[in-house]
């Protein structure tokens, strides 16, 4: 039994660029109505009655509540959350091997609060909105797809806070899927490897040759549309629930 995307309503966090933008565009192309939640105002080419742009921070309870309420006011319901917002920063280390000094606490805190606490915040606030939905033929009332990473499965010593936050998202998604199963709500995470996104390019430095970074096979970076296609596949496949969907070109150890 395939879940229909057309006429469904989704909130996409981090929808202003990268994986989130590609996800929002694909869902809109498939006939969904989408609220794009981003730190920056998003300007789109889709009809006004199909898309809503809300500026805010996933760490802010009031911002997320405002986005959810705006979604209900405009579209009348919420069928799913595609949580793509996240950060990756240079200097992500608990201990600097060169200076023999502790890592920058501000950097570590920003990564963990955005990636992990932002995921907690969006997930917890969205759940009540699913409960008023009429269940489909499978009994589903809603779906959450979080964005983790291959580094959540195999941590990088050069990105300690990022890896830790992504591992926690994997655990959160599975635990939440089990808890919400009796309510008809699915929860998944997608664990991509190296992606060709503005965030990744900023992290490695625009002056470096991006071609030096690649997954095993295909030997290139993941394109955002490939992540979006994985989102579409998960939405349309009801039995995908409580697992980490690894999109990595065999890069994981």
Curated annotation (Swiss-Prot):
Subcellular locations according to the entry: Cytoplasm, Cytosol
Positions that bind substrate: 149
Catalytic residues in the record: 162 (proton acceptor)
Any one Gene Ontology BP term: pheromone biosynthetic process
UniProt keywords, alphabetically: Cytoplasm, NAD, Oxidoreductase
Annotated gene: IDOLDH
Any one Pfam family match given in the protein's UniProt record, by short name: adh_short
Major subcellular location class: cytoplasm
GO cellular component: cytosol
Positions contributing to NAD(+) binding: 12-40, 63, 166
Lineage, opening ranks: Eukaryota, Metazoa, Ecdysozoa, Arthropoda, Hexapoda
Keyword Ribonucleoprotein found: no
Tissue: Specifically expressed in male midguts. Expressed at higher level in the anterior midgut of fed males.
Protein function: Catalyzes the oxidation of racemic ipsdienol and (4R)-(-)-ipsdienol to form ipsdienone (2-methyl-6-methylene-2,7-octadien-4-one), an intermediate in the biosynthesis of pheromonal ipsdienol in male pine engraver beetles. In contrast, (4S)-(+)-ipsdienol is not a substrate.
Protein name: Ipsdienol dehydrogenase
Broadest EC class assigned to this enzyme: oxidoreductase
């Amino acid at each position: 039994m395939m879940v229909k995307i057309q006429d469904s309503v989704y909130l996409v966090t981090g929808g202003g660029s990268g994986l989130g933008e590609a996800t929002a565009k694909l869902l809109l192309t498939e006939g969904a109505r989408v609220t794009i939640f981003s730190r920056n105002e998003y300007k789109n080419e889709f009809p006004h009655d199909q898309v809503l742009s809300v500026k805010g921070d996933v760490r802010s309870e009031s911002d997320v509540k405002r986005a959810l309420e705006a979604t209900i006011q405009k579209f009348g319901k919420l069928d799913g959350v595609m949580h793509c917002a996240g950060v990756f920063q240079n200097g992500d280390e608990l201990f600097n091997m060169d200076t023999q000094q502790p890592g920058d606490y501000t950097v570590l805190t920003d990564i963990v609060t955005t990636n992990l606490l932002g995921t907690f915040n969006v997930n917890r606030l969205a759940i009540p909105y699913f409960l008023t939905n009429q269940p489909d033929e499978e009994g589903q009332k809603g779906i959450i797809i979080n964005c983790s990473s291959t580094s959540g499965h195999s941590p990088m010593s050069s990105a300690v806070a990022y890896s830790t936050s992504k591992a926690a998202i994997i655990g959160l998604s599975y635990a939440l899927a089990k808890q919400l199963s009796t309510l008809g709500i699915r929860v998944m995470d997608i664990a991509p490897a190296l992606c060709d996104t503005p965030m990744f390019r900023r992290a490695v430095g625009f002056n470096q040759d991006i071609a030096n970074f690649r997954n095993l096979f295909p030997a290139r970076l993941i394109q955002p549309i490939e992540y979006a296609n994985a989102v579409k596949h998960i939405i349309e496949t009801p039995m995908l629930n409580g697992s980490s969907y690894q999109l990595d070109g065999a890069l994981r150890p």
